[in-house]
A protein has these predicted regions:
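Solvent-exposed loop and edge beta-strand segments that line ligand/cofactor-binding
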Residues: 317-322, 416-429, 479-494, 527-544, ...
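An acidic-aromatic substrate-binding cleft motif
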Residues: 90-121, 233-243, 336-453, 458-466, ...
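Terminal, non-catalytic domain-edge segments
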Residues: 342-385, 568, 590, 599-635, ...
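Well-ordered alpha-helical scaffold segments within catalytic/enzyme domains
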Residues: 203-207, 335-336, 376, 431-447, ...
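Solvent-exposed beta-strand/loop surfaces of large extracellular or lumenal domains
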Residues: 33, 39-63, 304-310
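Long, well-ordered core segments of solenoidal/helical folds
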Residues: 387-406, 451-467, 510-531, 563-585, ...
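Surface-exposed beta-strand/loop patches in extracellular or lumenal glycoproteins
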Residues: 7-32, 213-224
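Beta-strand/loop-rich accessory regions of lumenal/periplasmic or secreted enzymes
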Residues: 101-359, 406-409, 424-427, 458, ...
Length: 732
């Protein structure tokens, strides 16, 4: 039995509210997704399942579950998952029919058609007795900085997901222009049984060699019924501010950098900042368009009038949004169709829930029992360590802006001059999404899941190369660099897939899975290049990080293609240690040196491989590497140095060493490995506890709050949590 806990959230009942959760299971526990039920007050809820990961024996590792539950006003509630099928009393209206050139969908509140090779999002849509024809739906449309206009062509619709409560339609299309190359675009429509809204996502890809400067980008619904139109736009910062007109006059709102600079907001912005919508209501029906996380993805604007609603993903007249070659970016908006008598308070309520949906939380014991994550689940908790981890995760900077949201600049890299005077973006170095997912599982704090979802969404869009004629770039993740990709490199040591796979399990969105596979394929191509053929000619983290990603992909897919290079890397580490007496790496022309944190990356990755394929020689290699590090890199003050040169052996502060020490203890049972990390652990906890700070300011194309990037938590969480657990096991 698994308990899904919902915290108290809104002050109104949400009946049959659509929700979703990712359920982990231990090997052999569940073999058939139809064998589970979700119970609320002993009544089975409507559910829809998708297996996102299995074990090698075919049993289910992760199960993505959509469900509809009655969530009460002003109080928490629990739902129970049981491993037995129960009959559901609710009969929900949801169906789709494939037509000659598209699909027809009906859910009891809405009926709509989509068609292939169309210039309109819907062919028809009917809601509350009102009929919209295709000419009502304009866009998405785009104008670049050269005033060249693009119009969306919806080329081919497919069903990405379908079940009793939810249908997800996906369309491959392109933004067309007669005078220049088209821009690939993906559109998704998510609809739920009995609900009168459509969650719409538009993902634009710059599959050209040139930089795309977006001057305007939007979508609109035109209103043909001009009489008795009520128009409204609204934004919220704590309370919602409405601009309305009872006779359909134009009302509009815009979000700019200056507005954000002048506005105070204390929310964790990945969870919620405010809502932002436009509504047009006639005598027959109304439609409200809400832009998801509009403040975070500024610039944005909305407009409503007797002519309909307009959603500006990039408003005309603002500074153009820059998309470098190979970038993608998804933006979402909800189209909520409602009766004409719907009160404005309920329209605002549904818009706000879209921004901050109810999310269930599982006990850490569920993840621990399933064994799907590293053993980081401490039972005798240390107050200072727990607070330091939360503080470090919460205090990361937030970078507002359509292309920046979900990433942060690294101010240390920037200060070093790596960007030639421009910001260096972290590009989710060290896998911040994965650290957040682990923290969510360990702590049960909902916002860490939101951190994971926001940053992984940025990672698969902006930080990954979606277009290039160079196969060594295509599908790979960019190293931290200026403008996210400008002048950047793609190398083995700066590509991560575990957080992306976490998001696949958490959302059921196969695009995360596809991106992870693409990164893995890129790593395989890189490993075939001359750079990686000679052991000791590069740092241990290069193939160390590669091994971590390849092992994760094997665990996820059981595809043997990931093992050939994994075995090759393991053997290369053996030859490397035999040749140099350790994993020494070149630094200057005439030196090879020890770098403790890079050696620790290799240790951590080898241990992941070892857990899949236990071998005595790997155990010996890991222990020898950690012994060598303690003998040569541990200073008299109890800390490890940064790098093995007189010019670089300053006090090291990299927590990755703690993971290597904890692994050595796990393999040997010898407490000396943990004792060698006492000072590093204390220093790391002190640094984490005092992380954060900084003012809000505008830099380049972002409004930045705080100064601590995501790297500190990404780099530190798993090593600290692993060492912390080892201390508990050792009784230290």
């Amino acid at each position: 039995m698994i308990t899904l806990h919902f915290d108290k959230l809104f002050n109104n009942d949400r009946l049959l509210e659509p929700c979703f959760v990712s359920l982990p299971f231990a090997k052999g526990t569940l073999t058939d997704a139809s064998s589970i039920s979700l119970l609320q007050d002993n009544q089975a809820l409507p559910i829809q399942t998708k297996i996102t990961s299995t074990y090698e024996d075919g049993s289910i590792r992760y199960l993505f579950v959509r469900f509809m539950a009655d969530l009460p006003a002003n109080r928490a509630t629990d739902i129970t998952c049981v491993l037995q099928p129960e009959s559901v009393k609710h009969t929900l209206p949801l169906s789709y029919t494939e037509t000659v050139d598209g699909f027809t969908v009906s859910n009891g509140e809405l009926t709509f058609e989509v068609e292939n090779h169309s210039l309109h999002l819907f062919r028809t849509l009917d809601a509350f007795g009102k009929h919209y024809d295709k000419e009502c739906f304009i866009g998405p449309y785009l104008t670049n900085s050269r005033q060249i206009s693009f119009q969306m062509s919806f080329d081919h619709w497919t069903i990405a997901e379908a079940g009793d409560i939810c249908i997800v339609l996906s369309c491959k299309g392109q933004l067309l222009c007669e005078n220049t190359s088209s821009l690939p675009c993906e559109v998704r429509l998510t609809v739920y049984a009995g609900k009168s809204w459509v969650d719409t996502s538009v993902r634009l890809i710059n599959a050209t060699k040139d930089t795309l400067e977006i001057s305007s980008y939007g979508f609109s619904i035109q209103e043909k019924e001009k009489d008795s139109v009520h128009s409204c736009v609204a934004s919220s910062n704590y309370k919602t501010d409405f601009l309305t007109s009872d006779n359909g006059e134009t009302v509009e709102k815009e979000i700019t950098a200056q507005m954000l600079m002048n506005q105070g907001n204390e929310h964790f912005a990945e969870v919620f900042y405010g809502t932002f919508f436009a509504d047009c209501t006639t005598r027959q029906c109304g439609v409200c368009g809400t832009i998801y996380q509009a403040f975070q993805n500024y610039p944005k604007a909305v407009r409503a009038s007797s002519s309909g609603i307009e959603l500006f993903l990039v408003p005309e007249g603002d500074t153009p949004v820059i998309m470098q070659s190979g970038m993608a970016r998804e933006q979402r908006f909800q189209l909520y169709f409602h009766p004409s008598e719907e009160p404005l308070s309920e329209i605002s309520n549904r818009s706000t829930i879209y921004q901050m949906p109810d999310r269930p939380v599982l006990s850490s014991k569920v993840y621990e029992a399933a064994g799907v994550m590293p053993d980081i689940f401490v039972h005798e908790k240390d107050f200072n360590t727990e607070c330091a981890l939360i503080q470090c995760g919460d205090s990361h900077a937030r970078s507002y802006g359509m292309m920046n949201w979900g990433d942060t600049p690294d101010m240390n890299y920037t200060a070093q001059g790596r960007g030639n005077g421009h910001l260096i973006w972290t590009n989710n170095e060290y896998d911040f999404p994965h650290a957040c997912m682990l923290m969510f599982a360990k702590s049960g704090i909902r916002r860490f899941l939101d951190y994971c979802l926001v940053t992984a969404n940025h990672q698969i869009d902006v930080d990954v190369c979606h277009y290039s004629e160079d196969l060594l770039l295509l599908g790979g993740q960019w190293e931290h660099t200026q403008g996210h990709t400008v002048g950047g490199k793609i190398v083995c040591s700066h590509q991560w897939v575990e957080g992306i796979l976490d998001c696949y399990h958490s959302t059921g969105d196969e695009r995360y899975y596809e991106t992870a596979i693409g990164i893995g394929d890129n790593i395989l191509r890189l490993l075939d290049t001359p750079t990686y053929q000679k052991e000791g000619s590069f740092s241990a983290r290069e193939t160390g990080w590669a091994l971590r990603s390849l092992t994760a992909l094997y665990t996820e897919t059981h595809d043997a293609k990931w093992l050939a290079k994994s075995d090759w890397i393991v053997n290369q580490f053996k030859d490397w240690a035999n040749t140099y007496g350790g994993w020494l790496a070149p630094y200057m022309d005439n030196t090879v040196i020890r770098v403790p944190f890079m050696i620790s990356v290799a240790v951590g990755s080898l241990m992941r491989y070892y857990r899949e394929f236990p071998r005595k020689d790997i155990r010996t290699m890991i222990l020898n590497a950690v012994d060598d590090m303690i003998e040569n890199c541990l200073m008299d003050n109890g800390l490890f140095y940064y790098k093995e040169l007189p010019s670089l052996n300053r006090l090291g502060n990299n927590p990755l060493i703690l993971e290597a020490l904890a692994i050595a203890y796990e393999l040997s049972g010898n407490k000396k490995y943990l004792q060698a990390g006492f000072k590093t652990y204390a220093k790391t906890i002190e640094n984490m506890a005092h992380s954060g700070g900084g003012t809000k300011h505008t830099l380049e194309d972002t409004v930045l709050t705080g100064s601590t990037g995501t790297k500190q938590f990404a780099q530190g969480f798993l090593p600290v949590a692993t060492y912390y657990k080892a201390l508990e096991k050792a009784g230290l």
